[in-house]
């Protein structure tokens, strides 16, 4: 009976460690996804800002040179 209790305790301990590691890995995967979304939004904002800046510079160049 004592060896059976040890076996159950060992299985419970190993199962708890495995579950803990899986939850940490899942949490790390969730964080990466959020960073990718943030990067995607920032890339979009940067692209729009570059386009607006380029059009403003073209208009300014035309005003200066008299296009």
From Swiss-Prot:
What InterPro entries does this protein's entry cite? Answer: Antimicrobial_frog_2, Frog_antimicrobial_propeptide
Tell me the compartments it is located in. Secreted
User: What is the role of the protein in this entry?
Assistant: Antimicrobial peptide.
Signal peptide positions (record): 1-22
Intrachain disulfide bonds: 62-67
* Family stated for the protein in its record: Belongs to the frog skin active peptide (FSAP) family. Ranatuerin subfamily.
Pfam families linked: Antimicrobial_2, FSAP_sig_propep
Q: In which tissues is it expressed?
A: Expressed by the skin glands.
Biological process terms from the Gene Ontology for this record are: defense response to Gram-negative bacterium; defense response to Gram-positive bacterium
Domain of life here? Eukaryota
Q: What is the lineage of its organism?
A: Eukaryota, Metazoa, Chordata, Craniata, Vertebrata
Q: Which GO terms describe its cellular component?
A: extracellular region
Proregion span(s): 23-39
Q: What's the protein name? A: Ranatuerin-2Vb
* Principal place of residence: secreted
UniProt KW keywords:
Amphibian defense peptide, Antibiotic, Antimicrobial, Cleavage on pair of basic residues, Disulfide bond, Secreted, Signal
